[in-house]
């Protein structure tokens, strides 16, 4: 009888682990909030500064977001072109690709309540000068220098997050 009870308990634990290990898009929490995942990336201008990296990770955790996956790497020009393909016709595209492939980046999968919106708020406006005026404690205000060397990337929607996570981690 004890063996059956133990087997039943173990089966239940393994079933919960299998379910929780599976990736998910967004789950509803109390009050209608969404537990979701988003893609975040620290750009080469930040990855050359270990203190800035540590500060940004601390800010992520203080914002109630969890780093689910993290990978430091150097993106190839081809990977940058694919990632930023939606901007391929824009005049800044060649410079963006050159910058993003110039040094290490840190790819992050973040999870938490309304993660896409919260990460975007944490990084602030795209242009670092604008961020310093409008969101002085944002990551881009603190660590960015301009519109391109702006410290961090953040998915702009749950759909973009799903696409970017698949592209950068799968």
Residue ranges and their predicted role:
Residues 1-21:
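N-terminal chloroplast transit peptides
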